Amino acid sequence: MSVKNAMTADFLRSAYGGESMAHMRYLIWGEEAENSNYPNIGRLFKAIAYSEHIHAKNHFNVLKEDLYDSSVVAGAVFGSTNLIDNLQGAINGELHEIKQMYPVYLETARYQEEKEAERTFHYALEAEKIHAKLFQDAQDSAKENKDINIGKVYICPVCGFTTLDENIEQCPICGVKKDKFQAF
C-alpha cells in the first residue's frame, strides 16, 4: 500500500504516533491501577492499550511501503498523578480523537480517495467512542472508591473494536468473528 497524498500521509503518521503513545500510557496506567487495588480498571487499561496498538499498527501498515525517516508530532497526556486523573487523561485523549482528530483525518482521506487510510481512520474512530465510555464508567466507579464491575474485555484484532459483551458473534465494525477476539 502506498499513500499518494502528503496530507493523508502526515495524518497517518500523526495518528500512528498518538496511538503508539496511548498504547504505552495505558499500559503504565494499567499497572498503576492494579498496584492501587483496582484490578479491573487495570485490566481495562491494558485491554484498551491492545486496541490502541492495533490502531497504530493499522496506520503503520498503510504507510508500510513509504519507508523513510520522519518526525512524528502527536499530542499526548504525560505524567501520572492518581487513578482519577489518569482516567480523565484517557477520557480527554479519546474525546479529542472522537471530536477533532479522526473526523478531520477521515474526511481528508475520503476527499483524497485514500481508501486504506479511510478504512483505518474509520476503525479507530469507532473504537475510540467505546473507549471514552468505558473510561468514563471506570472513573465514575473510582470516584466512589470502587473498582469497575466488569467481566472480560474483548478486543477485535483487526479494527480494535472493544466490548464487554460475551455473547457478541462478530465485530460490528469489520465483521471478524468473535472467536478471533483477544480476551482480557
Swiss-Prot record:
Its EC number is 1.11.1.1. GO terms for molecular function: iron ion binding; NADH peroxidase activity. Fe(3+) 2 binds at residues 52, 94, 128, 131. This is Rubrerythrin-2. It is an enzyme of class 1 (oxidoreductase). Fe(3+) 3 binds at residues 156, 159, 171, 174. Rubredoxin (Rd) increases the NADH consumption rate by serving as an intermediary electron-transfer shuttle between NROR and Rbr2. Its cofactor is Fe(3+). Residues 151-184 form the Rubredoxin-like domain. Keywords: Electron transport, Iron, Metal-binding, NAD, Oxidoreductase, Peroxidase, Transport. Binds 3 Fe(3+) ions per subunit. Pfam families: Rubrerythrin (PF02915), RUBY_RBDX (PF21349). The gene is rbr2. PROSITE patterns: FERRITIN_LIKE, RUBREDOXIN_LIKE. Induction: Various environmental stress conditions, e.g. oxidative stress (exposure to H(2)O(2)) and other stress factors such as salt, increased pH, high concentration of solvents or cold shock, do not lead to increased transcript levels of this gene. However, PubMed:15336429 shows that rbr2 is slightly up-regulated after exposure to air, but PubMed:19648241 shows it does not respond to the presence of O(2). Is not repressed by PerR. It catalyses: H2O2 + NADH + H(+) = NAD(+) + 2 H2O. Coiled coil: none annotated. InterPro entries: Ferritin-like, Ferritin-like_diiron, Ferritin-like_SF, Rbr2/Nigerythrin, Rr_diiron-bd_dom, Rubredoxin-like_dom, RUBY_RBDX. It comes from the Bacteria. CDD domains: rubredoxin_SM, Rubrerythrin. The keyword Transmembrane does not apply. Functions as the terminal component of an NADH peroxidase (NADH:H(2)O(2) oxidoreductase) when using NADH:rubredoxin oxidoreductase (NROR) as the electron transport intermediary from NADH to Rbr2.
